[in-house]
Swiss-Prot record:
Pfam family membership, one: Ost4
Membrane-spanning residues: 5-25
Phylogenetic placement of the source organism: Eukaryota, Metazoa, Ecdysozoa, Arthropoda, Hexapoda
Annotated localization: Endoplasmic reticulum membrane
Cystines in this chain: none
Name by which UniProt lists this protein: Dolichyl-diphosphooligosaccharide--protein glycosyltransferase subunit 4
Family: Belongs to the OST4 family.
Organism: Drosophila virilis
Intervals, Lumenal compartment: 1-4
The keyword Endoplasmic reticulum is annotated on this UniProt entry: yes
Function description: Subunit of the oligosaccharyl transferase (OST) complex that catalyzes the initial transfer of a defined glycan (Glc(3)Man(9)GlcNAc(2) in eukaryotes) from the lipid carrier dolichol-pyrophosphate to an asparagine residue within an Asn-X-Ser/Thr consensus motif in nascent polypeptide chains, the first step in protein N-glycosylation. N-glycosylation occurs cotranslationally and the complex associates with the Sec61 complex at the channel-forming translocon complex that mediates protein translocation across the endoplasmic reticulum (ER). All subunits are required for a maximal enzyme activity.
Topology in the lipid bilayer: Single-pass type III membrane protein
Amino acid sequence: MITDVQLAIFSNVLGVFLFLLVVAYHYINANTGKSSIKTK
C-alpha cells in the first residue's frame, strides 16, 4: 500500500512537473507569437 510520505512525494513531483510544463508552454507560445508578428 502507498504510505502518506510516498503519496506526498508523488504529488509534489507531479505538481512541479505540471508547473514547469505550463511555464514552458507559455514561454514557447510567447516567443512564437512575437516572431510571427515581426515577420508579418
